[in-house]
Amino acid sequence: MTNIRKTHPLMKIVNNTFIDLPTPSNISSWWNFGSLLGICLILQILTGLFLAMHYTSDTTTAFSSVTHICRDVNYGWIIRYMHANGASMFFICLFMHIGRGLYYGSYTFLETWNIGVLLLFTTMATAFMGYVLPWGQMSFWGATVITNLLSAIPYIGTSLVEWIWGGFSVDKATLTRFFAFHFILPFIIMALAMVHLLFLHETGSNNPTGIPSNTDKIPFHPYYTIKDILGATLLILALMLLVLFMPDLLGDPDNYTPANPLNTPPHIKPEWYFLFAYAILRSIPNKLGGVLALALSILILVLVPFLHTSKQRSMMFRPISQCMFWVLVADLLTLTWIGGQPVEHPYVIIGQLASIMYFLIILVIMPTASIIENNLLKWK
């Protein structure tokens, strides 16, 4: 008799995704981040659900309801901090996952890659709206500044911003709709993640060498389930260390002050995971130019597959490209640092140089390095 997991319509899907999935035998720990992102998403949905049971999306009570969750709800403080720091862990895993895709040439799976970019956009939108909900100073001013950027769009800009706000400023209507969107988007992310997996399983996983591994596949379970469990344990350990010992390390002290439209904080800045894009936005003096650069800093990922000029898929055997990849990582870390600094000398010029380098490396230097490597290997 055939095993039920191979015949039952529902079990068959689970079996083909997590148990009997043919997987390359040589994938490294960099391939752990997909499952870690799944764990992060489930964790965020669960903690978010419990927070939503006690939160009120009204400008007069939102801040107090978050305080109430932390002080009066049983284990409310741990749920709140797991949700806030869980978002940081989510983005750490996201950046590692994207970095892995860039390094090993996983972007040649076009559908999987493009849905991944869409997932990144959706996650960023969700995180931004979530940051507005506690209705602290940085929540209010962050929402005002970022939504106001849309007013740079010619002709329809101002109307669009007022339509998003639901009035002439960020107010009750804005908070209510942000809560509604913040609640629904994670489920859309979950659906997109399933489509992401569907397309991945059409082609099978890439591997560090970038060479097709159809001749050497092993079942996902038990080899990679045990590896994923180790990764998940380390992720939860890191998250709980953050939650229990340094819950406010990655937050902003200004968000412990209730929102006040009459008092602007000295330095308006988003959460750390948006700082690189914020630095690119600020590096251009023109408003529309800044908005375009901000959008392009993420949209550029869609162009990466078309900029691949190497005869090899992975960077494993391409030292010049490897070097440029790590320069890009250093550049992104520089942008993240600059995004958190005030707009004054020397930060402005450093931010502008780092922004130019970011686009230059992706659009010009890396494709050129690949062509040089092809020629060095006599691959015309």
From Swiss-Prot:
Heme b b562 binds at residues 83, 182. It comes from the Eukaryota. Keywords: Electron transport, Heme, Iron, Membrane, Metal-binding, Mitochondrion, Mitochondrion inner membrane, Respiratory chain, Transmembrane, Transmembrane helix, Transport, Ubiquinone. Gene3D superfamilies: Cytochrome Bc1 Complex, Chain C. A ubiquinone binds at residue 201. Binds 2 heme b groups non-covalently. GO terms for cellular component: mitochondrial inner membrane; respiratory chain complex III. It is found in: Mitochondrion inner membrane. The keyword Chloroplast does not apply. CDD domains: cytochrome_b_C (cd00290), Cytochrome_b_N (cd00284). The chain crosses the membrane at residues 33-53, 77-98, 113-133, 178-198, 226-246, 288-308, 320-340, 347-367. One of its GO terms (biological process) is mitochondrial electron transport, ubiquinol to cytochrome c. Heme b b566 binds at residues 97, 196. The keyword S-adenosyl-L-methionine does not apply. GO terms for molecular function: metal ion binding; ubiquinol-cytochrome-c reductase activity. Its main location: mitochondrion. InterPro entries: Cyt_b/b6_C, Cyt_b/b6_C_sf, Cyt_b/b6_N, Cytb/b6-like_sf, Cytochrome_b, Cytochrome_b_C_euk/bac, Cytochrome_b_N_euk/bac, Di-haem_cyt_TM. It is a multi-pass membrane protein. Its cofactor is heme b. Component of the ubiquinol-cytochrome c reductase complex (complex III or cytochrome b-c1 complex) that is part of the mitochondrial respiratory chain. The b-c1 complex mediates electron transfer from ubiquinol to cytochrome c. Contributes to the generation of a proton gradient across the mitochondrial membrane that is then used for ATP synthesis. Belongs to the cytochrome b family. Heme 1 (or BL or b562) is low-potential and absorbs at about 562 nm, and heme 2 (or BH or b566) is high-potential and absorbs at about 566 nm. The cytochrome bc1 complex contains 11 subunits: 3 respiratory subunits (MT-CYB, CYC1 and UQCRFS1), 2 core proteins (UQCRC1 and UQCRC2) and 6 low-molecular weight proteins (UQCRH/QCR6, UQCRB/QCR7, UQCRQ/QCR8, UQCR10/QCR9, UQCR11/QCR10 and a cleavage product of UQCRFS1). This cytochrome bc1 complex then forms a dimer. This is Cytochrome b. It comes from Capra sibirica (Siberian ibex).
